[in-house]
């Protein structure tokens, strides 16, 4: 591998996110429906390094070059396989930090998949997903990068049917950052009756947890605690619904909010208004 290899690393939204329990080892068990998105995206430019190990550089401040999801993924793979190729990685960030889009998790999955593709003795998908779960709950999903249900601590992945063809998904990324660690801490500290408030978006109930139901009540366990500290995110969600969205929900631990529109023209109108307020907005035709 003498030439640079550019790995494209996308993001995700959670169309349903239940934090079901906190385990004794500190990990949280989840039950979530994931949808991969191509935009926004990061790029990892990989070249051969000078010595076994990995060196990561990034122009964005706040990313520790020695301890990040990419280095953790490399270390986990090397420990499990004994394969330690010399790599240099330039991380070009396009996914907003603290937005609940899983940018760091996608970076980890990208390097795991890359190592698996060049290793003389690949570990196999099952082992790779177990390694991924140790890095973060979203990482196993990005190993697959298809619409799926994730349970356990994120390592149990089940691909699902997707009935929203023809909808437009609008993703809004305000100038707000929410720490995932803070959100989990706030969730743990909240009383059960305070945090189990449903993020009501459409009508009906989730009859089949292995599919995305058009009549589902989309839910995010983080919304009550995050909205309490960042009421502007609640206002953003309400604004999307006023623009005719069939559904709107915060993704992950925030701060991004997405909406599903049946009518493309409603999505276009919301897109233009949010752009006018300085919010990063992305459109996806599903």
Curated annotation (Swiss-Prot):
Primary enzyme class: transferase
Name used for this protein in its record: 4-diphosphocytidyl-2-C-methyl-D-erythritol kinase
Family: Belongs to the GHMP kinase family. IspE subfamily.
Residues that coordinate or bind ATP: 96-106
Pathway noted in the entry: Isoprenoid biosynthesis; isopentenyl diphosphate biosynthesis via DXP pathway; isopentenyl diphosphate from 1-deoxy-D-xylulose 5-phosphate: step 3/6
Keywords: ATP-binding, Isoprene biosynthesis, Kinase, Nucleotide-binding, Transferase
Active site: 12, 138
Catalysed reactions listed for this entry: 4-CDP-2-C-methyl-D-erythritol + ATP = 4-CDP-2-C-methyl-D-erythritol 2-phosphate + ADP + H(+)
Alphabetical GO biological process terms: isopentenyl diphosphate biosynthetic process, methylerythritol 4-phosphate pathway; terpenoid biosynthetic process
Pfam families reported for this sequence: GHMP_kinases_C (PF08544), GHMP_kinases_N (PF00288)
UniProt GO MF annotations: 4-(cytidine 5'-diphospho)-2-C-methyl-D-erythritol kinase activity; ATP binding
EC number: 2.7.1.148
Coiled coil, from the record: none
HAMAP family with a match to the protein in the record: IspE
Gene name of this polypeptide: ispE
InterPro entries in the cross-refs: GHMP_kinase_C_dom (IPR013750), GHMP_kinase_C_sf (IPR036554), GHMP_kinase_N_dom (IPR006204), IspE (IPR004424), Ribosomal_Su5_D2-typ_SF (IPR020568), Ribsml_uS5_D2-typ_fold_subgr (IPR014721)
Secretion signal span: none
Free-text function comment from the UniProt entry: Catalyzes the phosphorylation of the position 2 hydroxy group of 4-diphosphocytidyl-2C-methyl-D-erythritol.
Annotated source species: Nitratidesulfovibrio vulgaris (strain ATCC 29579 / DSM 644 / CCUG 34227 / NCIMB 8303 / VKM B-1760 / Hildenborough)
């Amino acid at each position: 591998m003498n030439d640079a290899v550019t790995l494209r690393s996308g993001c995700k939204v959670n169309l349903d996110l239940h934090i079901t329990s906190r385990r004794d080892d500190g990990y949280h068990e989840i039950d979530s429906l994931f949808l991969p998105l191509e935009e926004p995206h990061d790029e990892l430019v990989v070249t051969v390094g000078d010595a076994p190990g990995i060196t990561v550089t990034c122009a964005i401040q706040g990313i520790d070059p020695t301890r990040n999801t990419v280095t953790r993924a490399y270390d986990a793979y090397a420990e499990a396989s004994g394969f330690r190729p010399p790599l240099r990685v330039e991380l070009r960030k396009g996914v907003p930090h603290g937005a609940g889009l899983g940018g760091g998790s996608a970076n980890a999955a990208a390097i795991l998949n890359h190592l698996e593709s060049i290793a003389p003795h690949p570990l196999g998908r099952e082992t790779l997903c177990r390694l991924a779960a140790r890095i973060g709950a979203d990482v196993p999903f990005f190993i697959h990068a298809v619409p799926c249900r994730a349970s356990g601590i994120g390592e149990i992945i089940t691909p699902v049917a997707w009935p929203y063809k023809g909808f437009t998904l609008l993703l809004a990324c305000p100038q707000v950052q929410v720490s995932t660690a803070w959100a989990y801490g706030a969730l743990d500290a909240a009383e059960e009756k305070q945090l189990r408030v449903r993020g009501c978006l459409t009508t009906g109930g989730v009859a089949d947890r292995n599919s995305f139901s058009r009549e589902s009540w989309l839910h995010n366990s983080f919304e009550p605690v995050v909205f309490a500290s960042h009421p502007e995110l609640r206002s953003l969600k309400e604004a999307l619904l006023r623009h005719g969205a069939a559904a709107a929900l915060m993704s992950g631990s925030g701060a991004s909010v997405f909406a599903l529109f049946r009518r493309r023209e409603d999505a276009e109108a919301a897109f233009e208004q949010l752009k006018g307020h300085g919010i990063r907005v992305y459109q996806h035709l599903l």
